Amino acid sequence: MNRRIIFISALFISLFVSTNVWGQTFDPWVYENPERVIYAIEKSWSKTPLKVGNDFPKAMIRNFAKSFCSQYQKYAPNVAMTLYLKKPGQNKVEDDNYYMEDDPRNGYIKCNMPGQFDYLTEMCYWKRANGHSLVGVLLQMGHEGEGVDDDSALLFYDFDPSTRTMTPDMKVYQTVKDILAKHVGTPTFNLPKEGKDIRVHYIEFIQTDENDFKWEQNTLKWENDTFTEIEGETGLY
């Protein structure tokens, strides 16, 4: 049985189980090839400002997540997070297929769908000097056991509380893209659960007698309303 068939079968099972958790009927074929969905979102997101509701007055990260995830419903973690946010105090945060991290106090939320095709939606936000917020959205998919074969999109929005609108922040987005372009390795990210900085893990395939991959762990430091890269550890494995 090839990998494509295995993936579709596993995804069908996971979505069926999730139907029992969140009371929603899924069409598993919609979520085929999630890496293509990530690519499609990154190609189009800059054209679409998002209105933000106020369903959670004391948990802005939930409002941001609901706004973004409801806009992009062809990506399974977004669907799961949208359904979770209908009743976040009552819905399960974990089953065999989805794991939610919901931390309103620290302004952080994540929905992860583990397995061979481990993929997630992760969000947080930073306060800006002008009273706005910078909202970070990470869509990431990693093929377990396949080294550098990862797909991700790291997007940024400026939230204006006076208009309750999330506008794509292309300046910050391009700053981060320019930093990443200096590296050969494939990046994966961890948005901050606490603190302000983003962790970036680069993995580069190399051909040697003893090692196949080179890794580099750096930090995108948030200060003065922008990100700068701080170099960290490197190694081989």
Predicted regions and their residues:
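Acidic/hydrophobic-patterned starts of short beta strands in beta-sheet-rich repeat architectures
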Residues: 132-141, 194-200
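Terminal domain-start segments
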Residues: 23-127
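Short aromatic loop motif centered on NTY/YTY
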Residues: 165-237
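Cleavable N-terminal signal peptides
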Residues: 10-11, 21
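Bacterial N-terminal signal peptides that target proteins for export
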Residues: 1-8
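Short, surface-exposed coil-to-beta transition loops
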Residues: 118-121, 135-138, 148-154, 183-185, ...
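Mid-length scaffold segments of soluble, non-membrane domains
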Residues: 134-169
